[in-house]
């Protein structure tokens, strides 16, 4: 459950002076950190982290295990850990930072953002004149033509800081 205060903001004194982190994020961070450190993760570590997040949503869901990954060609543990994080933290503002940390933004960011599958569904009949472009799978394209440059992995250093310290060098691509 997402958490928020019950206090009203009418007095303009609402705010928090401490970080807020969901327990699910802690568990996902743990699973990712263990895997990235060791290039593997035990089923025990999966059961005390990522699988708790999965099973909270659907107790009947098959737990993620090393055996499941081995039995299914095309699956790999790193991708599954990242996929679970993407799903659980959807729309919470983590995605861009995750893509930067994983250094996958150059492949993910230029991809089209797609919405619902429209063609071949009941919506195609109800909304006969869909004003949006669709892709080959019949999904509405929300945004396309996005670009990503290597320099976007780092922010530019503020010019006043560069002037204060001549030993600082501007981040690559921001010169």
PLM regions: where:
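Acidic/polar-rich alpha-helix caps and helix-coil junctions
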Residues: 1-175
């Amino acid at each position: 459950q997402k958490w928020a205060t019950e206090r009203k903001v009418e007095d303009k004194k609402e705010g928090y002076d401490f970080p807020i982190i969901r327990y699910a994020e802690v568990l996902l961070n743990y699973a990712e950190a263990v895997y990235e450190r060791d290039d593997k993760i035990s089923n025990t570590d999966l059961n005390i982290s990522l699988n708790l997040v999965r099973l909270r949503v659907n107790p009947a869901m098959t737990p993620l295990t090393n055996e499941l990954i081995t039995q299914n060609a095309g699956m790999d543990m790193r991708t599954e850990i990242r996929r679970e994080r993407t799903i659980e933290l959807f729309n919470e503002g983590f995605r861009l930072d995750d893509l930067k940390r994983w250094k996958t933004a150059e492949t993910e960011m230029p991809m089209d953002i797609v919405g619902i599958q429209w063609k071949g569904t009941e919506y195609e009949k109800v909304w006969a004149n869909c004003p949006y472009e669709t892709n080959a799978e019949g999904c509405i394209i929300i945004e396309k033509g996005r670009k990503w440059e290597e320099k976007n992995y780092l922010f530019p250093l503020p010019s006043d800081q560069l002037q204060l310290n001549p030993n600082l060098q501007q981040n690559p691509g921001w010169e």
